[in-house]
């Protein structure tokens, strides 16, 4: 591999990791981390928390649809929009005075992640256009892990004030977004954008058919993953865990996600379906463990670490899956599958928010785990129609 190739391409991977870390780890997925403290100050009960989380997931989905339509032609504009929405929303959460003012800010903040993913998939794909891009794509997607580690470390090391944590997240998002724009040097050598070489906005019919089972699986696993993301720390605190213990579990969750950066090279020989099944199975086992035994500190900590690795692995499998179907529409496919993944999380957050006060974490988390297993098992035997669909 040429030295010049390493010199100017990999800085984009590093800045991409930072933007995913900020928009996902520090902003989109940090709501559950800060929820116990925010609930006390803003008067957010479990039902309201579920609705706010669902609104954030819907906002993410809408943003990802925009990314679906715009990523192929305007990835840099999406990076700017992702930075503004995630950063601005984080500031809005920091200054919120009650649940009514927190909800729209949380929704705006969640949009940043939905815009960032398809944009970065496109930027990485064109930067590594003449080389295998699965590893850099997996590394960028694993930025969620370091972001979660940082989200947990900030209240332990810098400040316990949840408002200041959100302000720090806003600043980090701005820095990461600017870094991506600076390190995206592939635009300098990109071909002239003519009608002949422009990708179509909407993929062909066969492309949609090839994604049917992936869409169904991602919705189911999204529901399964929603339990830990939205209520995991709350369940740990209610079971008697101290603030330090519950935050440490969140940091371990991030460490598990960050470990994907290392394991991506070791597992790159596996097909996306296999990675998806592994991720879905471990997400479900982790969810079941935390719901059944939240007071067991060692078990809960291990479950969080496993969940973090499994979640990032599963989401990375979605990128690999759609790229395998049609690399030219990888950004659009990522947006589509991340939308359906978050639709599942929105449904799960709302339903679990209503159910947990009635049935408790054991039953609620077990139901989520069962749906997660269903999401993984649905791909063991792919539908005949998809299996025979032409690779377009």
Stretches with model-predicted labels:
Residues 105-142:
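Cytoplasmic helix-loop-helix junction between adjacent transmembrane helices
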Residues 24, 108-120, 306-318:
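Core transmembrane helices of Major Facilitator Superfamily
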Residues 325-361, 365-368:
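A late C-terminal transmembrane helix in Major Facilitator Superfamily
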Residues 273-318:
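C-terminal transmembrane helical hairpin of 12-TM major facilitator-type secondary transporters
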Residues 63-75, 259-272, 356-357:
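Helix-to-loop junctions at the C-terminal end of transmembrane segments
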Residues 99, 130-185:
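Helix-loop-helix hairpin linking two adjacent transmembrane segments in secondary transporters
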Residues 62-97:
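Conserved MFS/SLC helix-loop-helix module at the cytosolic interface between two early adjacent transmembrane helices
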Residues 43, 95-101, 293-295:
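Helix-breaking motifs and short loop linkers at transmembrane-helix boundaries and internal kinks
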